[in-house]
Amino acid sequence: MHIARIPRTAATLASVAAMMCATLTACAPSGGSAAQSASREGTIAVGLPGSLSTLDTAHETGIINYYVAQVVSEGLLAVGKDGQLIPAIASSYHTDDAQTWVFDIRPDALFQDGNPVTIDDVLFSIDIAKDPDKSPSSAVYWPAGVQAEQSGDNQITITLPAPAVNFGWTVTANGGLWITEKSFYEAAASYGSSADLIMGTGPYKAVSFQPDSKAVFEKSGTWWGGDTPAQTIEFDFFSDENARFLAQKNGTIDIATQLPIDQVSQFQGIGGVSVLTESDRSYVGLTFDQNVEPFDDIHVRKAIAHAVDRSTIVSSILKGQATVATGIEPPDQLGSEIGEQAATDAQAGLPIDSFDLDAARAELAQSKVPGGFSAELTYPSSIPDLGSAALAIADNLKQIGINLTVTSKPIEEWISEVGSGTYGLSFMSYTSTTGDPGEVAGWLLGPDNPARYENVQVQGLIASQAAQTDPSARVADIVEAERIAQDNTIYSPIWWGKTSTAFSSRVTPTQYTPYFFMTPWASSLELAK
């Protein structure tokens, strides 16, 4: 799906996101540099639907940040094409009780400057990852009280305050750990900036970065995983989807990710271009903040939820490239251990405020604002499908007396306001980056959730599911937490999505799966000579 993953804390910098504008010239890049890069032998140019303000994913956890991170950074573990955990900087790991995790550090791992990865570097990186000041967008992945220490010549042990069967995802570059060189980080005035760049262990090293324009990475020659097909990976940032389409058509970019639904057929019509569509295990819905009036009134929340025509949004706006959501966990995400159909069945009975304008009017009449009110719903300009859905919702709300203003914002600004209390009504666009069955619910229903929702029973269930070793029991806890929250209309699920990516004839992905861009994907491209 085309949406971006949004960060897990209200204090995060801007990005998601899936969880990413309309003249025919690119807002960025400029000067024909993308054309030069795509035509240069050994270079792959990737057109992203948005921009980065930093290369430090710990400060900006948008989905396109994660795409970029996979070429330059690694954690202790990584995600394979099947969504399972695989070795990265740790050559192996084990845990007997899901509380004590032992990692054997790869002795041949090097940073991109040729220096070896030391235990001190790994422990330093973990300290940075846990620190909410240094990792404002991702420190929430790390439970309070976690301890990491050296336990052998090339071994570390991480001890959690309580068992967490999903902790393995935390130490991936898809979750909350990007191993860096201590001396490089400490010498940087602003790690991840255009001046300081970034240091990692991945197959490509950062050589230049222009926020809102491009980021360029060259093959490092130091990666433990071996050689990679391209010499250079260039990410070009587009805020104008029409400009990105023209760039693909003219051959100035090789890959375009997260295509808008209404442009998929246009990309398919470009000679030599292949468009691949897969589930991205994403969730889109409305979020209600009970701490903001009048959304503290359940009748107001239900009035709005009843005015959302999910089926029409999916069939018309999304052209069937999504599924009407009955819960917050996409079935292929929730079912990663028990199976997608079992997960679908588990969520089939969840309470949902179905589309019914008469019911919406009745709820509003019982509320503290029976005469209606005005509100604002914002969406990121790089996710036009959200804007179209918002306008459809606004049209329905107008019929019951609620005046909803729909506002487009730069994705950085939009994300910075998520969970901040600025709005009582907001979109949630979340694209999973791991194979953890409880990833979405773990944030949306956990203690630092963007709805600022406090419910002891719900958050107890979220805590207990993380310790469940029985996959079915774990899903049962997650679904029960969803049931309570949806019964109170804290979230109003709309759709579970898919994403489409365009590849030029110069580039062929191998083993393309829903997890492709969450793996070290640059090593899985075949580049035409």
What are the residue ranges of the model-derived segments?
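Structural transition elements
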Residues: 323-363, 384-386
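Ligand/substrate-recognition segments at binding pockets and active sites
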Residues: 361-432
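Alpha-helical secondary-structure segments
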Residues: 118-125, 155-159, 202-203, 230-232, ...
